[in-house]
């Protein structure tokens, strides 16, 4: 299991979700991906995408105008 980070700052909907989806395609089951973004819609969109696609949201938080969502690949 490996840890990866995706910088989706300054991207607007739907790009954070699309970039997340593209990155996850390259990862293995059990890997962890931390997505850093600034689009408030991502706080709902990425967890919804993760659930639909069998991944698990480990955490989501807002800090210094950034949203950090951690997903474990399912």
Each predicted region: which residue ranges?
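Amphipathic, hydrophobic secondary-structure cores in small proteins
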Residues: 15, 19-55
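Absolute protein N-terminus
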Residues: 1-2, 74
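C-terminal structural segments of small proteins and small subunits
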Residues: 47-74
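Residue-identity detector for glutamine
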Residues: 5, 21, 28-29, 62, ...
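Short amphipathic
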Residues: 2-9, 34
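Generic structural detector for well-ordered beta-strands
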Residues: 7, 36, 70-72
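A generic structural signal for beta-strand entry/edge sites
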Residues: 3, 32, 64-68
């Amino acid at each position: 299991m490996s840890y990866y980070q995706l910088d989706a700052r300054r991207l607007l909907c739907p790009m954070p979700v699309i970039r997340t989806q593209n990155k996850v395609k390259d990862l293995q089951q059990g890997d962890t991906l931390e997505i850093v973004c600034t689009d408030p819609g991502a706080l709902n969109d990425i967890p919804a995408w993760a659930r639909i696609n069998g991944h698990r949201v480990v955490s989501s938080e807002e800090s210094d105008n950034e949203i950090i969502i951690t997903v474990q690949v399912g």
